[in-house]
Amino acid sequence: MKDRYILAVESSCDETSVAILKNDDVLLTNIIASQVESHKRFGGVVPEVASRHHVEVVTTCFQDALDEAGLEASDIDAVAVTYGPGLVGALLVGIAAAKAFAWANQIPLIPVNHMAGHLMAAREQKELSYPLMALLVSGGHTELVYVPKAGEYHIIGETRDDAVGEAYDKVGRVMGLTYPAGREIDQLAHQGRDTYDFPRAMIKEDHLEFSFSGLKSAFINLHHNAQQKGENLVLEDLCASFQAAVLDILLAKTKKALAKYPVNMLVVAGGVAANQGLRERLASDITETEVVIPPLRLCGDNAGMIALAAAIEYEKHHFAGWDLNAIPSLAFPNYKE
């Protein structure tokens, strides 16, 4: 049987990425051009800057992916692209590039939801067993998703305000840490103790919603008041206390979801899934359900995860027309229960 190759494009935020998937789950290449250095001085992603960077490097990423995989454009059977959620200008660059490649080679165009991509990144780690529960944690999203079968998603809980990754970056900025702050906070937390009392919003309530704005505000107020009084705060203990509160919230809601929905496994994915503290808590706290987490290289935004999600859509012949457009606030295919 002839091998099938899907080329995937990801440009929803500040990473330009092109990957090539062989058959169902073999990633041949996953080119990522990061813009982190360009956005550090702003303390966050500037949409217009991100879009311009995508334009500058996307063509090179295409060629690098083909070269690294040892393939020609004519070998590609389909093109997948993230069409939301994300920054509209950034998304449009990837969509335009994917359309051009698909049109030039007369091959199908596969639309992929960015968050479905994060979830399906776990496919490279292990074959997924349905039904499953997914905890998706990133800079823009915090969601619990029930997945009864491949390609069907039901959001059963989400954040009411800040995403968990956003909270990390905001408190990191207050402490003067470099953007993005998640990794540094995680490292500092492992050197400190949970000595500061931060709130765990809605942790005892039965619903599956998250909230991190109160925790973020409590952290900022504590830091501000200490500065006003000239008090010294222990940075490592601050990070340890903040992270302990975050993880308590995430684990409490995840356990409630697993109790309500019988599943075969728990997938934890998204940029925050790279957090070592989270991985340690999952290993110690979730013992009756198999936990699957993508490898570190597939936790952040990348086209490899888009390709892995696209393979499922390809089998369903879920192709887009040439009128495919960016949807910045794109939701999962199913309505929230």
Swiss-Prot record:
Keyword terms: Acyltransferase, Cytoplasm, Iron, Metal-binding, Transferase, tRNA processing
Gene that produces this protein: tsaD
Disulfide bonds, paired cysteine numbers: none
Reactions catalysed according to its record: L-threonylcarbamoyladenylate + adenosine(37) in tRNA = N(6)-L-threonylcarbamoyladenosine(37) in tRNA + AMP + H(+)
Cofactor entry: Fe(2+)
GO biological process: tRNA threonylcarbamoyladenosine modification
Enzyme Commission (EC) number: 2.3.1.234
Family, similarity comment: Belongs to the KAE1 / TsaD family.
Residues where substrate binds: L136, V137, S138, G139, G140, D169, G182, D186, N275
Residues binding Fe cation, per UniProt: H114, H118, D301
Cofactor: binding comment: Binds 1 Fe(2+) ion per subunit.
Protein name as catalogued: tRNA N6-adenosine threonylcarbamoyltransferase
Any one GO molecular-function label of the UniProt entry: N(6)-L-threonylcarbamoyladenine synthase activity
Job of this protein: Required for the formation of a threonylcarbamoyl group on adenosine at position 37 (t(6)A37) in tRNAs that read codons beginning with adenine. Is involved in the transfer of the threonylcarbamoyl moiety of threonylcarbamoyl-AMP (TC-AMP) to the N6 group of A37, together with TsaE and TsaB. TsaD likely plays a direct catalytic role in this reaction.
Gene3D superfamilies for this protein: 3.30.420.40
Cellular component aspect of the GO annotation: cytoplasm
Top enzyme class: transferase
Localization (cell): Cytoplasm
NCBIfam families from the UniProt entry: gcp_kae1, T6A_TsaD_YgjD
